[in-house]
């Protein structure tokens, strides 16, 4: 009997995390067993190439895998995700232990390929072709109940081709998933215990607006999913500001289970830089969307992505981004220094900034964001919210057990409960007692349900 142990390492976005979760369930249904790093025969690396740093981490990890499995002569590696799509079969020559490379559309066929590789030790395979339609996967939920908070893919790829972004080249052109299939997966998850669903896509607002769509708009999809029995909370990521429709904005005011938090990537606060980036909106348009969202749902919380040091960014441009953070008052922003991505338009732009300038600006921006985040969390003190409890907190309570979960605004909340409480996957009314740097401390204010 061949060794069928596996271990998965994941880099990058929530879509990658969701892909890895599906792959793990699919492998276990085929008789594979999870094992710790360095002990598994098969190590799968699900990669990200949005920035240079995670790509370099992949190469470093492959070196560590080679060392960790040096005493397992039959050990091998599968590399998936965006770096696999980008580098392709080049992995075979650079890293001999790699025997499978699979792209984002090839994921659906990866379990069958790994079955073959376990049985045929001299075989190497690549699954790098983009499919014409959404690459539908086997419905694999695993054994027992599913987590209370789950993710559902609604589309693959992107047609925006922002100047800095490699995603359209590594995940392919946009392909919307069939509405009926999405709803079927949501129902199955709810039947197995899910209570919160997050819809995933590179640009969810353009769902259905491609040759693979069935005429359903994203706003219509939101209403269909929100109406499913048993769904207590609904979220989605990631929208593009240029495509956000009035009907989506209105949904925040009309759908009671649509959570009042939205990740709305700005990328830069300078109109000149936004134009160079190819974002196809300006600050005036973005701020109108923010105003409309707050009119529809006054308590909505916003977060963003910010790129610091885009080619040609002046100090004045950067200060406009800083002003934008203050004006919007983001609860959080995911900020990073610009890095060239191969094949993108921005790679060819002149006036690249030095690493020192980019890092100095990033530090200033993150200092400002930390202050804004602390202010947003402080505003929660004294409020009563319901927390979906995910598990035990790493920080033990002074008395009893300490649990953690998320409130409707996406804040991480820690709460002390009597020892032995069985509340995983349940909602708990709490009153926020204290704001920490990146989380909240709360006290129980009602019975779990």
UniProtKB/Swiss-Prot annotation:
Entry-linked Pfam families: Radical_SAM, UPF0004
Domain MTTase N-terminal: 4-119
GO molecular function: 4 iron, 4 sulfur cluster binding; metal ion binding; N6-isopentenyladenosine methylthiotransferase activity
EC number in record: 2.8.4.3
Entry binding sites for [4Fe-4S] cluster 1: 13, 48, 82
Keywords: 4Fe-4S, Cytoplasm, Iron, Iron-sulfur, Metal-binding, S-adenosyl-L-methionine, Transferase, tRNA processing
Domain of life: Bacteria
Compartments (UniProt record): Cytoplasm
UniProt: [4Fe-4S] cluster 2 binding residues: 158, 162, 165
Entry-linked InterPro entries: Elp3/MiaA/NifB-like_rSAM, Methylthiotransferase, Methylthiotransferase_CS, Methylthiotransferase_N, Methylthiotransferase_N_sf, MiaB_methiolase, rSAM, rSAM_horseshoe
Transmembrane segments: none
Keyword Chaperone: no
Domain Radical SAM core: 144-375
Names of required cofactors: [4Fe-4S] cluster
Cofactor, how bound (note): Binds 2 [4Fe-4S] clusters. One cluster is coordinated with 3 cysteines and an exchangeable S-adenosyl-L-methionine.
Main localization, broad class: cytoplasm
Any one of the GO CC terms: cytosol
Family in the record: Belongs to the methylthiotransferase family. MiaB subfamily.
Record's subunit section: Monomer.
Family annotation (HAMAP family): tRNA_metthiotr_MiaB (MF_01864)
Its biological purpose: Catalyzes the methylthiolation of N6-(dimethylallyl)adenosine (i(6)A), leading to the formation of 2-methylthio-N6-(dimethylallyl)adenosine (ms(2)i(6)A) at position 37 in tRNAs that read codons beginning with uridine.
Name under which the protein is recorded: tRNA-2-methylthio-N(6)-dimethylallyladenosine synthase
Species assigned in the record: Nitratidesulfovibrio vulgaris (strain ATCC 29579 / DSM 644 / CCUG 34227 / NCIMB 8303 / VKM B-1760 / Hildenborough)
